[in-house]
UniProtKB/Swiss-Prot annotation:
Enzyme class: hydrolase
Record function comment: This enzyme is involved in nucleotide metabolism: it produces dUMP, the immediate precursor of thymidine nucleotides and it decreases the intracellular concentration of dUTP so that uracil cannot be incorporated into DNA.
A Pfam family hit: DCD
Organism encoding this protein: Methanococcoides burtonii (strain DSM 6242 / NBRC 107633 / OCM 468 / ACE-M)
Top-level taxon: Archaea
GO molecular function list: dCTP deaminase activity; dUTP diphosphatase activity
Reactions it catalyzes: dUTP + H2O = dUMP + diphosphate + H(+)
Protein name per UniProt: Probable deoxyuridine 5'-triphosphate nucleotidohydrolase
Higher taxonomy: Archaea, Methanobacteriati, Methanobacteriota, Stenosarchaea group, Methanomicrobia
Keywords, in A-Z order: Hydrolase, Nucleotide metabolism
Signal peptide: none
HAMAP family named among the record's database cross-references: dUTPase_arch (MF_00635)
Family, as annotated: Belongs to the dCTP deaminase family. Archaeal dUTPase subfamily.
Encoding gene per record: dut
């Protein structure tokens, strides 16, 4: 696997379909080695979830949307929250992606948990933010919170992602 550069990412963002759409400011969000993804919505997690081998018993945790204040800010107490991103990704069958939190989150006592973005996946992804700071953490709507790193696969996958999260949150 080879990590894509800013130049390669720009070409793919401008392609049809775009690698990443609904960007707030492409020039700001395109970084030397990835695309910064932004905050659309935060939800609480207030019920248990479940996962099994064949997904017959899968149950997603329920939660409520936390509203931004009149200035566009949310204060998060220590804990775990779901995050919905602004951007929609359209990953071709010769790429995959992984995400890392922006270092500012870590310096403030918060981090993100994410999964792999599979070749062929399209959708508006969710991830999890964990606030470790005992005093909490403040986030503004549209804040750049993660960097999505795209990797070129040695060969294109025969069949791209086709799971239940395909085209999610669009």
């Amino acid at each position: 696997m080879t990590l894509l550069s800013q130049n390669e990412l720009r070409e793919l963002v401008l392609a049809n379909p775009p690698l990443v759409e609904n960007m707030i400011d492409m020039d700001t969000q395109l970084q030397p080695n990835g695309v910064e993804m932004t905050l659309k919505e935060i939800r609480t997690i207030k019920s248990p979830g479940a996962v099994d081998f064949d997904n017959s018993g899968r149950r997603l945790s329920e939660g409520d949307t936390i509203e931004f204040n009149e200035d566009g800010w949310i204060h998060l107490d220590p804990g775990v929250y779901k995050v919905l991103l602004n951007e929609i990704v359209n990953i071709p069958k010769d790429l995959a992606a992984i995400a890392k939190p922006r270092s500012t989150l870590i310096r403030c006592g918060a981090t993100l948990e994410t999964a792999v973005w599979d070749a062929g996946y399209s959708g508006r992804s969710e991830c999890m933010i964990v606030v470790h700071n005992k005093d909490g953490f403040d986030l503004k709507k549209d804040a750049r919170i993660m960097q999505l790193l795209f990797y070129h696969l040695h060969t294109e996958v025969e069949e791209g992602y086709s799971g239940s999260y395909q085209n999610e949150n669009i």
